Amino acid sequence: MFQVQTAGTRTGTSSPDTTTSEAGLGSTPPMPDFDKQSYWHQRFESETAFEWLIPSSTFMPLLEAFLNKLPGSDARILHLGFGTSDLQVQLRTRGFVNITNVDYEPLAIERGRHLEMTAFGDVTMQYITADATNLASVPEISSQKYHLVVDKSTADAISCAGDDAVLAMAQGIHRSLADDGVWISVSYSAFRYDSPQLPFDVEVIARIPTAKARATDPDIYHYCYLLRPKPKV
């Protein structure tokens, strides 16, 4: 179980994509193509459950203060890049009934629907196959305004396609948020949302230490971000 520490700064960090291998063990292997649909299709052919960075049971307490501020159980929640996580199940268990789950890969849709059916005996949440960098092209999303958007390392995967892809995702979320809506994002990067072009005011609301194999290993954190939309122009 990870210990969660609140934090107001982004200092004192390293991230998985910048960690070098130990001396004598060779260079770090290349990163997978996390931004490619083909990668996720191949992965989800065999994977049925996986939690990126932190378990949903760790993420939910970080969301609690924001869930309590939502207008009611029918508040609109957008869950981007749900993959094979069970976060949407935990949100429904919490009592929310208007949850839209979006993923790039159709196999994730099958996994998500099956998981919900197994947990509740029915499927009431919405599942949409879509590119999170092009939300405006999805009528089911662009016609709605969401009170809460959540992602767990989806922006990290999209960042493999470059900063413009992350900005496109952020702009789509900005357009999709209700006036009082917020975006909560978990990332391994202390600099994921540093772009001055980002249409959000950004705050780190928690640092989550990663597990260490040895006591002498460096401290590595994951970051939970609160992104509040800047005024729409």
UniProtKB/Swiss-Prot annotation:
GO terms for biological process: methylation. Residues 9-21 have a biased composition (Low complexity). Its EC number is 2.1.1.-. A motif (Required for methyltransferase activity) lies at residues 140-146. InterPro entries: Lys/N-term_MeTrsfase_sf, SAM-dependent_MTases_sf. The keyword Nuclease does not apply. GO terms for molecular function: methyltransferase activity. Induction: Expression is up-regulated during sexual development. Expression is also up-regulated during confrontation with the arthropod fungivore Drosophila melanogaster. Belongs to the methyltransferase superfamily. This is Methyltransferase srdJ.
